[in-house]
Amino acid sequence: MKSFFKIFTIFILLLNIALGNPEKKIVKIGLGYSGRSYDPHKHTDSSTLAITKQIYNNLFILDNENEVKGELIENYSIKNNTIEMDLKKGILFQDGEELNSEIVKKSLERNKSIPVTKVLVDPIEKIEVIDKYKLRIICTTNVDILLHNLTHSSMAIVKEDKNKKLIGTGAFKLLEWGTGEKVILEKNDNYFKGSPKIDILEFLTIPEAPNRYIALETNEIQIAYDISSIDVKAFKNSKDLEILNKLSYGTDFLSINTEKAPLNDKRLREAISYAIDKDSINEVIFENTSKVANSIITPNTFGYSNKEEKKYNLEKAKQIMKDYKTPIEIELWIYEDTSKYQMAQIIQANLKEIGIDVKIQTLELSSFLQLTAQGKHNALIGLWYTSTGDADYGYYPLLHNNSRGGVGNRSFYNNQRVNTLLDEARKEPLKEKRKEKYKEIQEIILDENPIIPIVYKTYNIGINKNIKGFKFNPNGNHILENIEY
């Protein structure tokens, strides 16, 4: 009798497969932080956008050469400060409604009403709907800047349903968000680029980098974002795992609150800059896999200038510090991240050598973002992705007076020359002249040190060797629509 039931069970399983009910293909991805919301317009942190990138699409994306090309756009033309664009026809939202010009207009206007993304659509003066599939955007600035801005993952085109729930056109649709620690997406069979080969994506929050590696090794997950440089070595001896590492658009930096004494003193910030041993940070924390930074923006970003940074010079730093007779104490804020804590420890030791006592304060990410936006800090260690591949998105949010606080300028820096150069660069039609303005900005920042760039981030992705079709994105929002497992 037992043999009969065993044979019957196997028969039922085979019958399910034959009838088109195979086991679902699931891929699990480990993130360092929880996604904050499925709304890409309101939260631009890398974990949120890593997830929402799979749910929504952009009008434009960047190719491997940092050139803008259409995603939802079939073709476009530029005349002076005006862009005319034709939408691809037949693209469906996940509720079955077709993409049209009115929805695109509403989505961009929504971006304009939200402070954190407003900076990206500021160049838009007016949006005109010509017909169901054609739009005209009139800009107040250089059109090229807007095109690059529209590639940012927070510029995804969204549609609100009758319950105000956001819907996208992406390869996967939201099944479960919960607290953000476990997010489940299911494939969109009507995806305009073709139905994904994976049925379910699960994004799991695994805060510690070594634990992400262990989860990958035990096949609890199949893809791990942001593998630590120390764990990279382990991949060399693995027959099942491989590491993908490329220069990202990200820069780790020290941001100094220029409104708080004594750090409002330019000379003190200069001493701090000379005292930080960036080479040691790269060697000890990143095992020389990253690159010492001389700018907020990375070398693969338009507008980058290879200006020599202030080299580590302890004697110069000590010489400047002779002017300060009273002890100096500062708090250095970081969010929960192993490499940020290690970086803070090295900076703490560096500054102790010149008489500055640094106390490290570790905060949960949401508290860190909220309190630093309010200017409660002395200094912080941050990471910024110039995700558009254009210097405007590196410099304008981090340095312009209009961007103070939550938009990005957490150093509360206000330099009229820098403000003017940024405004002029947005209006300048010639790329070479724009580059000259960004070069001058970089020189001013290296002189005044409101932000001290430390290293350019190399992004390490650990994947199971059975994963095929993974597409690396230098902004950290990797594309999973074509993966197979």
Q: Residue spans of the language-model regions?
A:
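Gly/Pro-rich hinge or "lid" segments in bacterial periplasmic/extracellular proteins
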Residues: 43, 64-65, 143-196, 200, ...
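Long beta-strand-rich cores associated with HINT superfamily self-processing modules
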Residues: 461-485
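Ligand-site clamp/hinge motif
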Residues: 190-233
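Extracytoplasmic/peripheral linker and loop segments enriched in polar/acidic and small residues
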Residues: 357-368, 396-465
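Append "and occasionally in soluble cytosolic enzymes with long acidic Gly/Pro-rich linkers
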Residues: 264-349, 353-354, 414, 440
